[in-house]
């Protein structure tokens, strides 16, 4: 489980070419100020504004004990002035939401009810992404419902079609999400995150592997060695 807050700022960075992820949040100068809990992001919307926010996982000791809006302000107040991430440039309020992830809401099917997206805890624990997985689970659910309808609503055959939904869902994402839950437990420890950022970030090949793993960007059929390793780990991991 996680919590995220975000807001929008009028900023010259609105046309940045890339999404920016912050694995460490500092209250001042990096390495010489307080290390804040959580991770952050900045991405330009291309319309004069930037979406800026931070998230905290429940594996962090700060989870549930922190004023997340204040935490966001403390981080952004120490970013460069020309980025314009200041209160006077904020467009709208800071909004927050829970991040149900890694299949933490189950069962996914019970007595005719199928859970998709956030209702079923389907946010990717590796990166906090939820929209794509909501759509993917909805497609699997819709297929099961169509099969059930074709077999005759209320019939035993229809029930079997509906009951196949969580099975197919776990076959598709279960192992990968199990890896993600393990990842979340590890990065909840600041010492682990510090070692990973210090020794991992400078290594391009390792970062390419990390990007594929965290973003779930592997090729299931014709991928390279990295794809095959990640796919193998996902198959081996229990689909719980």
Model-derived regions: residue spans:
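Aromatic side chains
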Residues: 8-9, 39-43, 75, 103, ...
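Predominantly flavin-linked oxidoreductase catalytic cores and closely associated redox partners
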Residues: 1-87
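C-terminal helical "tail/cap" subdomain of flavin- and related membrane-associated enzymes
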Residues: 146-240
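A general structural signal for short secondary-structure boundary/capping elements
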Residues: 22-29, 86-92, 98-101, 210-218, ...
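FAD/FMN-dependent oxidoreductases across multiple families
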Residues: 58-144, 150, 157
């Amino acid at each position: 489980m996680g919590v995220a807050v975000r807001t929008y700022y009028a900023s010259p960075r609105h046309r940045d070419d890339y999404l920016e992820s912050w694995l460490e949040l500092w209250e001042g100068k990096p390495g010489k100020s307080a290390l804040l809990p959580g991770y952050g992001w900045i991405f330009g919307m291309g319309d004069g504004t930037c979406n800026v926010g931070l998230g905290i996982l429940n594996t962090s000791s700060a989870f549930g004990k922190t004023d997340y809006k204040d935490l966001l302000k403390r981080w952004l107040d120490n970013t460069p002035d020309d980025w314009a991430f200041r209160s006077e440039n904020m467009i709208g309020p800071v909004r927050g939401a829970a991040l149900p992830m890694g299949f933490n809401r189950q069962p996914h099917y019970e007595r005719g009810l199928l859970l998709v997206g956030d209702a079923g805890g389907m946010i990717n624990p590796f990166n906090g992404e939820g929209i794509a997985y909501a759509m993917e689970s909805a497609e699997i659910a819709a297929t099961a419902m169509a099969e059930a309808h074709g077999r005759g609503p209320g019939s035993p055959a229809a029930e079997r079609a509906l009951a196949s939904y969580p099975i197919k869902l776990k076959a598709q994402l279960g192992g990968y999400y199990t890896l993600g839950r393990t990842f979340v437990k590890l990065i909840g420890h600041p010492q682990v995150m510090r070692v990973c950022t210090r020794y991992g970030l400078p290594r391009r090949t390792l970062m390419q592997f990390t990007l594929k793993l965290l973003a779930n960007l592997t090729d299931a059929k014709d991928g390279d060695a990295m794809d095959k390793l990640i796919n193998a780990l996902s198959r081996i991991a229990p689909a719980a």
